[in-house]
């Protein structure tokens, strides 16, 4: 950190060699392992910054960030807004109800409109998979994916990885990656962009990933992503080091995928009894929002020694500060950039 508490660039890479050559961040799938580790290292420094009494800097002073959310959000929108403001940027929030999409404007026209506003970065959440890639191809500034349909939610996976790394370090089990860990993700895998991004991120960091869901909520061919599928929750939990629970995304379900919430909890809810099937010191995670009494019991979610759910929320601000900082470096004239900013970065 500098004398005023502002983080300096990670020392993982030699001077002049930029570790993140991408103009936008729309998915984990396009990241190399060293790029994921670089983002986490940069975010690590912002964790310390955010724990100071003075949590504001002028790193992005004079820059404008648009948070364009075409889907409702609470924690993700707040996290990005806080991240931008702590960096000193001017942050403008655009909600779905306020957008011209409600009046019939096409996504391409929306992208053209956003580009004409000359923002320095745009954060986008959209209900359609691939929408963020499309917008990124039409604008001249960095784009961050805050979740698109059932596709990806990259900053969620990064903050989950950072929260897990922090928890392991607190136990004296610190390592830059997750080699040797078995992580079970259980819930609505079919509709979950969080699951997809986490599978990619956790595997890139060396973890073995299991996914568990009722047959109707398990994507066909999920094993092609390298995850081991289970329908039996008890079997999926056996000996795992981390249990990551996901909510049922009823807003994306057009039919009856489960008999009832009560039946789902009976078969797939994480209880104290089920937690005993995991490794003795297994950690519990949930990206939120939680449906207590459905996918997870309150006494499990609130376990001080095992649950790192609130830590996940804390890490979200740090990860998003790091991403905003890194992606705007070329626009701020900083040296060491190897990539090209602009259209088609993730095509």
From Swiss-Prot:
Keywords from the UniProt entry: Pyrimidine biosynthesis, Transferase
InterPro entries named in the record: Asp/Orn_carbamoyltranf_P-bd, Asp/Orn_carbamoylTrfase, Asp/Orn_carbamoylTrfase_sf, Asp_carbamoyltransf, Asp_carbamoyltransf_Asp/Orn-bd
Top-level EC class as recorded in UniProt: transferase
PROSITE patterns: CARBAMOYLTRANSFERASE
GO MF annotation list: amino acid binding; aspartate carbamoyltransferase activity
Source organism superkingdom: Bacteria
Enzyme Commission code: 2.1.3.2
Keyword Transferase: yes
Catalytic activity: carbamoyl phosphate + L-aspartate = N-carbamoyl-L-aspartate + phosphate + H(+)
UniProt pathway: Pyrimidine metabolism; UMP biosynthesis via de novo pathway; (S)-dihydroorotate from bicarbonate: step 2/3
Annotated binding of carbamoyl phosphate, by residue: 75-76, 125, 153, 156, 288-289
GO cellular component, one term: cytosol
PANTHER family: ASPARTATE CARBAMOYLTRANSFERASE, ORNITHINE CARBAMOYLTRANSFERASE, MITOCHONDRIAL
Subunit structure: Heterododecamer (2C3:3R2) of six catalytic PyrB chains organized as two trimers (C3), and six regulatory PyrI chains organized as three dimers (R2).
Function: Catalyzes the condensation of carbamoyl phosphate and aspartate to form carbamoyl aspartate and inorganic phosphate, the committed step in the de novo pyrimidine nucleotide biosynthesis pathway.
Name of the molecule in the record: Aspartate carbamoyltransferase catalytic subunit
Organism: Erythrobacter litoralis (strain HTCC2594)
């Amino acid at each position: 950190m500098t004398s005023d508490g502002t983080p300096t660039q990670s020392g993982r890479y030699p001077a002049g060699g930029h570790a993140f050559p991408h103009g936008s961040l729309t998915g984990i799938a396009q990241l190399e392992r060293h790029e994921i580790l670089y983002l986490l290292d940069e975010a690590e420094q912002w964790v310390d910054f955010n724990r100071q009494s003075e949590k504001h800097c002028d790193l992005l002073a004079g820059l404008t960030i648009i948070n364009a959310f075409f889907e409702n959000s609470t924690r993700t929108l707040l996290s990005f807004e806080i991240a931008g403001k702590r960096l000193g940027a001017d942050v403008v929030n655009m909600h779905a109800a306020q957008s011209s999409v409600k009046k019939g404007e096409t996504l391409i026209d929306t992208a053209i409109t956003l580009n004409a506003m000359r923002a320095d970065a745009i954060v986008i959440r959209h209900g359609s998979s691939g929408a963020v890639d499309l917008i990124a191809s039409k604008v001249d500034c960095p784009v961050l994916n805050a979740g698109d349909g059932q596709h990806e939610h990259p900053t969620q996976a990064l903050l989950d990885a950072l929260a897990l790394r922090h928890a392991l370090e607190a136990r004296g089990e610190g390592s830059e990656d997750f080699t040797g860990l078995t992580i079970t993700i259980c819930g609505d895998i079919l509709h979950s962009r969080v699951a997809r991004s986490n599978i990619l991120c956790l595997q890139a960091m060396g973890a073995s990933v299991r996914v568990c869901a009722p047959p109707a909520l398990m994507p066909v061919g999920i094993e092609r992503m390298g995850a081991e599928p289970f329908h039996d929750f008890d079997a999926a939990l056996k000996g795992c080091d981390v249990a990551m629970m996901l909510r049922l995304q009823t807003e994306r379900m057009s039919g009856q995928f489960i008999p009832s919430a009560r039946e789902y909890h009976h078969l797939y809810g994480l209880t104290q009894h089920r937690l005993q099937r995991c490794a003795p010191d297994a950690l519990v995670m949930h990206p939120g929002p939680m449906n207590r009494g459905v996918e997870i019991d309150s006494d499990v979610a609130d376990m001080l020694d095992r649950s790192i759910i609130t830590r996940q929320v804390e890490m979200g601000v740090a990860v998003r500060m790091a991403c905003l900082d890194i992606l705007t470096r070329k626009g701020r004239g900083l040296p060491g950039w190897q990539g090209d900013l602009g259209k088609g970065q993730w095509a």
